[in-house]
């Protein structure tokens, strides 16, 4: 891709439109290079030049990205209007110069913020402030960078349209959205009221079938219903099993699953015999982290999460528009959303940076509203932003509400005896989280909301925020064995007891082995710049892990 961009830049010529075209290409190239560098690490900046690629450090790469974006934006002539035929060649913006300029500034804000843990932090601050000072960045849906998608086999194929993928709600996402914002499910969908459960109820506990070795505060519970209060975006993102009235209903058969409303025999006894039927109909549960990472004595008896049919028939799945793609709405693949600019400004303001008069609270609220508008739930935004209710990991929405959560008495049902019992619900211990500061401070709120808004297309950005800040709260993999032969050898069965570490979360993607076979010298050079072996656990230069190792 960078080869084509470089070639286009060479051929641009001096005609004003083609000068703009060159700058648009440079902005797109910067985005592509950043995606590579944020996935793998060191990148060859002379890639696509016709020379043998030579890897550069991550610092050099980011310096190049920021310089390119600034220079390209400054060289765009916004007075140039493309012809109709020219506009057809740009599926994103139709070569509208002002939109590309906003994208360039927005990306500059994004990548400057990436460097807060590095020796370029002061430069990052200056870059960010310069990019946002004129207010010329992406603020509305009309300026967003997104593309149509479909479920075929072409350049517009959506990443979520493959029927064999297990695209189910995760335990992390379920905990974040439960009770967040205090908006009742009954208000959102009156027909779902009968399935709701009070916030103080945790569900059925199956401690013989779900792993205990994790810091997930809802571990081993199966909620036999929907939370009383749920973030309004949840039911737009995910389809509840057997919810035939949902606008985002998917055809279960398209996922290779026949759903049994009465439940499937999925929890086994020690002899491997079917013992308990579980129904996923109208329930809100997330697949536990690490459910398929290593052999587990406990999970070997749980077909609910160790089989594809169990997951697809019992857990909420990404809704119809994600599965089919589309030219409008949620089916479009987002590369930069309006909400991201606002959450970047909010974080910058919290850090004390100059955000051109935009306060942290204002930017935070605008980010939430932009996300709600995108998901079509804008009518709930005002009440949501005033909520002081905590989600399952101890974070509330209201920006000025920074009181840390306290444990509370909850009820549950023993899954084996069917007896109702009480338990003290414990939120994660703030000092033991990867962030390590608080569960409900302003930065946690900002990144929690940013994470939810970025779903599902901007997962790389969400991953980058987690690697950089340790936010939002990701529960540790429920691990019952030493993962011999895997990259995550530091994560032992009892690691969760002492708290989180960056060593327990993947930090990067591996370079493909084709690089080794095609250019062994540069492969070794890249690893030298990376500072470690070609594994997923080597922290990138800008990450929290690199700062702590």
Give the positions of each predicted feature.
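C-terminal functional modules
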Residues: 300, 305-321, 325, 332-342, ...
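Structured, solvent-exposed acidic/aromatic patches
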Residues: 1-344, 348-374, 440-441
């Amino acid at each position: 891709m960078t080869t084509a961009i470089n070639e286009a830049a060479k051929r641009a010529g001096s005609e004003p439109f083609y000068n703009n075209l060159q700058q648009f290409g440079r902005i797109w190239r910067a985005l592509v290079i950043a995606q590579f560098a944020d996935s793998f690490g060191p990148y060859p900046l002379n890639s696509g030049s016709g020379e043998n690629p030579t890897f550069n450090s991550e610092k050099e790469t980011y310096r190049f990205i920021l310089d390119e974006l600034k220079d390209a934006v400054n060289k765009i002539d916004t007075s140039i209007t493309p012809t109709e035929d020219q506009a057809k060649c740009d599926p994103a913006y139709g070569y509208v110069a002002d939109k590309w300029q906003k994208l360039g500034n927005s990306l500059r804000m994004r990548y400057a913020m990436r460097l807060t843990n590095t020796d370029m932090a002061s430069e990052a601050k200056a870059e960010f402030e310069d990019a946002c000072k004129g207010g010329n960045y992406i603020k509305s849906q009309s300026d967003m960078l997104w593309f149509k998608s479909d479920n075929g086999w072409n350049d517009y194929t959506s990443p979520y349209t493959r029927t064999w993928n297990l695209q189910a709600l995760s335990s992390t996402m379920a905990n974040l959205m439960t009770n967040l914002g205090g908006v009742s499910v009954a208000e959102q969908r009156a027909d779902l009221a009968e399935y709701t459960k009070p916030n103080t109820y945790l569900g059925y506990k199956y401690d013989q079938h779900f792993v205990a070795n994790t810091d997930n505060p809802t571990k081993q519970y199966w909620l036999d219903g929907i939370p009383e209060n749920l973030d309004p975006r949840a039911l737009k993102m995910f389809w509840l099993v057997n919810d035939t009235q949902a606008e985002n209903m998917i055809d279960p058969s398209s996922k290779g699953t026949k759903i049994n409303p009465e439940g499937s025999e999925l929890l086994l006894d020690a002899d491997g015999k079917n013992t308990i039927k579980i129904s996923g109909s109208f329930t809100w549960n997330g697949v536990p982290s690490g459910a398929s990472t290593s052999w587990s004595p406990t999970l070997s008896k749980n077909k609910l999460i160790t089989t594809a049919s169990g997951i697809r028939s019992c857990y909420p799945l990404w809704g119809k528009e994600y599965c089919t793609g589309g030219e409008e709405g949620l089916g479009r693949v987002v590369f930069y959303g309006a909400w991201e600019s606002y959450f970047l400004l909010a974080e910058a303001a919290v850090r004390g940076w100059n955000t051109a008069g935009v306060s942290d609270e204002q930017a935070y609220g605008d980010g939430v509203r932009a996300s709600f508008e995108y998901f079509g739930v804008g009518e709930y935004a005002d009440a949501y932003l005033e909520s002081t209710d905590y989600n399952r990991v101890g974070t509330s929405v209201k920006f000025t509400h920074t009181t840390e959560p306290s444990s509370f008495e909850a009820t549950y049902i023993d899954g084996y005896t069917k007896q109702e019992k009480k338990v003290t619900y414990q939120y994660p211990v703030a000092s033991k989280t990867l962030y390590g500061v608080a569960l409900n401070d302003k930065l946690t709120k900002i990144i929690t909301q940013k994470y939810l808004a970025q779903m599902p297309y901007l997962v790389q950005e969400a991953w980058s925020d987690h690697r950089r800040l340790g936010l939002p709260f990701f529960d540790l993999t429920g691990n019952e064995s030493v993962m011999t032969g895997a990259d995550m050898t530091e994560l032992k069965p009892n690691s969760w007891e002492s708290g989180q570490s960056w060593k327990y979360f993947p930090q990067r993607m591996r370079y493909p082995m084709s690089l080794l076979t095609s250019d062994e010298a540069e492969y070794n050079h890249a690893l030298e710049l990376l500072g470690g072996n070609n594994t997923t656990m080597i922290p990138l230069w800008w990450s929290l892990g690199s700062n702590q190792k």
